[in-house]
Amino acid sequence: MTKGILGKKVGMTQIFTESGEFIPVTVIEATPNVVLQVKTVETDGYEAVQVGFDDKREVLSNKPAKGHVAKANTAPKRFIREFKNIEGLEVGAELSVEQFEAGDVVDVTGTSKGKGFQGVIKRHGQSRGPMAHGSRYHRRPGSMGPVAPNRVFKNKRLAGRMGGNRVTVQNLEIVQVILEKNVILVKGNVPGAKKSLITIKSAVKAAK
C-alpha cells in the first residue's frame, strides 16, 4: 500500500549519526492531512483518495469549496491533492507523519525555484564558445539548424524562462520522523523554495 502526505518545505540543516557521520537533510513540516473524498471506479472511474492540507480562512473560499470540506467536518484547505493505491480510509480521516519511519524510501515532488529569463548555458547546460577576441560568439546558442528548411525546428533549445516546473526526486531516504512537531527529515535536497508545497509518497522504483 502506498504512503503519502502533503507538507511544506522548511529548509535544510544537518545532523550527525551515532558514528559521527555527517548527513545533510531537508526539513519538511507535514501537519495532519484530512481526507476530503474517497473516489471509486463506480462513481469517478478510478480509485484515489483526495486529501487537503493547510487551513485557509473561510472568507477566501466559495460556497462549493465550503460544502466540499463540510462533508469531512474540517476547515477549507489551501492545497488539495490525490493519492492512489491508498486503502482503508474514510472521509474525515487524517494522514499524519506517523505512517512513515526512519529508513523509508520516498519520492518527493515540488515546484522548482523560478530563475527568470536565462540563456542556453545555464538553462540547458550547453558549452560556451571561445572567449578570445577573434570569436564571433561567446554565450550564444550556436547553430539554428541546416539551411534547407529555412526555419528553426520546434523544440530547439533556446533561451527562455527557467524554473517553476513540477519536479520529482526519486528514492530519497527518510532519516528521522519527529512526531511531536509533525516534521520529516529527508536525506539530501528536494525541489522548491521555503514554504512551498511538497508531496511525499512511497517510492515507485525503490529496490525491493
Curated annotation (Swiss-Prot):
| Coiled-coil segments | none
Q: Enumerate the residue ranges of region (Disordered).
A: 116-148
Gene Ontology biological-process entries:
translation
The GO terms this record gives for MF are: rRNA binding; structural constituent of ribosome
Keyword presence, Repressor: no
TM region positions:
none
Q: Which family does it belong to?
A: Belongs to the universal ribosomal protein uL3 family.
Q: What is this protein called?
A: Large ribosomal subunit protein uL3
